């Protein structure tokens, strides 16, 4: 099982000019370019990929094309979030059968589940697949906040082993690492650079759709080389994209 580290682009989904069809030629070219630019991983069908705007056939076809085109060169995660647990299970099984290295799952975003309901939801999904689950915490869009204490509870599920922590509070990165220890690897969301400084080992980045090389380099300088001064210089250059 691959370990996920580095900057992962949460990918756009290219459409035709009229907005009615997915542009698969552009999608393949985009994947090739991302890999050439040195990105460490790709995530399809996240919020940036407009997963809620796609029907089931489109979700399947986009997932398959991303996985096939990447061809193992970098890890691929597929967003399999849905309101219904059984839909999440179906999408997640499908992603695994297609060859995804993992799935990224936002909590049910309308029903505001309790902590125990969240645990049961993710436990049922985890029991249905053998690849890792990356939790996606974005309370601004999901209407659910996976607090560090809840994440600790969810980390008791064997293959719930990653989280995209996408609030503006980077102290959560520190707290999740402290509470979960080696059971949970934290990826920053919006605050990638700041998350690295607090111990995150990855970044699920939107801006790397535009500047993959620079976003990947920021991870290397911050986490691998520990060259904070040079990392800060790159961060200043890419901040307008992040903002």
What are these regions (language model features)?
Residues 2-145, 151:
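Active-site beta->alpha loop and helix N-cap motifs at the rims of alpha/beta catalytic domains
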Residues 127-128, 139-243:
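Catalytic alpha/beta core domains of metabolic enzymes, predominantly
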């Amino acid at each position: 099982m691959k370990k996920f580290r580095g900057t992962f682009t949460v990918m756009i989904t290219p459409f035709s000019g009229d907005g009615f069809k997915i542009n698969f030629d552009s999608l393949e070219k985009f994947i090739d370019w991302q890999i050439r630019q040195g990105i460490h991983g790709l995530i399809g069908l996240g919020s940036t990929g407009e997963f809620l705007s796609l029907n089931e056939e489109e979700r399947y076809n986009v997932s398959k094309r991303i996985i096939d085109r990447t061809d193992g060169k970098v890890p691929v995660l597929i967003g399999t979030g849905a309101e219904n647990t059984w839909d999440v299970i179906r999408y997640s099984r499908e992603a695994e059968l297609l060859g995804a290295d993992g799935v990224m799952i936002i909590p049910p975003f309308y029903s505001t589940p309790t902590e125990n309901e969240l645990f049961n939801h993710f436990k049922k999904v985890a029991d249905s697949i053998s690849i890792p689950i990356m939790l996606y915490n974005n309370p601004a869009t999901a209407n659910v906040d996976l607090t560090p204490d809840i994440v600790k509870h969810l980390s008791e599920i064997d293959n719930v082993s990653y989280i995209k922590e996408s609030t503006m509070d980077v102290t959560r990165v520190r707290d999740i690492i402290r509470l979960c220890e080696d059971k949970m690897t934290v990826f920053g969301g919006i605050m990638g650079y700041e998350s690295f400084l607090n111990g995150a080992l990855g970044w699920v980045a939107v801006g790397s759709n535009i500047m993959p090389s620079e976003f990947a380099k920021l991870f290397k300088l911050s986490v691998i080389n520990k060259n904070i001064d040079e990392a800060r210089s790159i961060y200043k250059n890419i901040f307008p994209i992040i903002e």
